[in-house]
């Protein structure tokens, strides 16, 4: 299995390399990631200037890694079209430092990168974890879950037409009771505009304020707030539950296998 890994936090993000550490146990991993942070870039594609690519020193020996002076979408497009010469079997984006829940997926660079794989008929995963301190403490939990999902895509237990958005609590897997398939919550934030003046001219800051919508019960937000792992299947009708299901035995099996993987260390 050949896996393209990208993100929107930049090529030296700890989340990306925690993910690579686990995915290299599943298949051959190639990293193509932005040369700097590109959060909230959504589906941005660079069309009006050239893209510059540099082969970089990997943080894990033996991994082929490239940095791209562009968006997360640019990275996946470049990886699939130019940098990886053999067919790619899976695109994984993350581990994002910060959750991507509800309608946040529409502006997420993490999800945008995974979308580029899905649009090219490659199964794709976006994986995120909350940031409650300067650095998430349990990146390996998210990495182990992603590795188990990748194994099930490889074996055919999960559809190879999947585009999955996964959000995990920042907890060790032994403290997470369930992985749940969820729909996306609806409106989660509202944007406001703050005005200031620098002595010469006006300037503006866009701010996002989190809402607490009433319809969050059983959604991706509800799951993570209750200490569960949320897995949502994305497609062209993002806010309708698509025909993606996992049996309870399958979700329990993924969690158990990921826990066992984490216990090996």
From Swiss-Prot:
Q: Which UniProt keywords apply?
A: Cytoplasm, Hydrolase, Metal-binding, Nucleotide-binding
Would the keyword Nucleotide-binding turn up in this protein's UniProt record? yes
Transmembrane stretches, start-end: none
Cofactor remark from the record:
Binds 1 divalent metal cation per subunit.
- Protein family per UniProt: Belongs to the SurE nucleotidase family.
Any idea what job this protein has?
Nucleotidase that shows phosphatase activity on nucleoside 5'-monophosphates.
Q: What is this protein called?
A: 5'-nucleotidase SurE
């Amino acid at each position: 299995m050949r896996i393209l890994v990208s993100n929107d936090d930049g090529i030296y993000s700890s989340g990306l390399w925690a993910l690579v550490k686990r995915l290299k146990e599943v298949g051959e991993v190639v990293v193509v990631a932005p040369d700097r942070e590109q959060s909230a870039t959504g589906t941005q594609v660079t069309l009006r200037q050239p893209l510059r690519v540099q082969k970089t020193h990997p943080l894990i020996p033996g991994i082929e890694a490239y940095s791209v002076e562009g968006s997360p979408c640019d990275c996946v497009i470049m990886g699939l079209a130019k940098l990886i010469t053999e067919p790619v079997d899976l695109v994984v984006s993350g581990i994002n430092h910060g959750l991507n829940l509800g309608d946040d997926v529409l502006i997420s660079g993490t999800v945008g990168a995974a979308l580029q794989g899905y649009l090219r008929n490659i199964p794709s995963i976006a994986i995120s974890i909350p940031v409650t301190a300067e650095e998430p403490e349990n990146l390996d939990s998210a990495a182990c879950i992603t590795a188990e999902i990748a194994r099930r895509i490889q074996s055919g237990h999960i559809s190879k037409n999947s585009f999955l958005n996964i959000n995990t609590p920042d907890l060790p897997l032994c403290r997470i009771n369930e992985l749940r398939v969820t729909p996306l919550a609806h409106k989660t934030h509202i944007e406001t505009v703050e005005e200031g003046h620098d002595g010469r001219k006006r300037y503006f800051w866009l701010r996002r304020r989190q809402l607490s919508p009433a319809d969050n019960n059983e959604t991706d937000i509800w799951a993570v707030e209750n200490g569960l792992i949320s897995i949502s299947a994305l497609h062209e009708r993002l806010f309708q539950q698509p025909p993606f299901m996992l049996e309870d035995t399958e979700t329990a099996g993924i969690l158990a296998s990921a826990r066992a993987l984490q216990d090996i260390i």
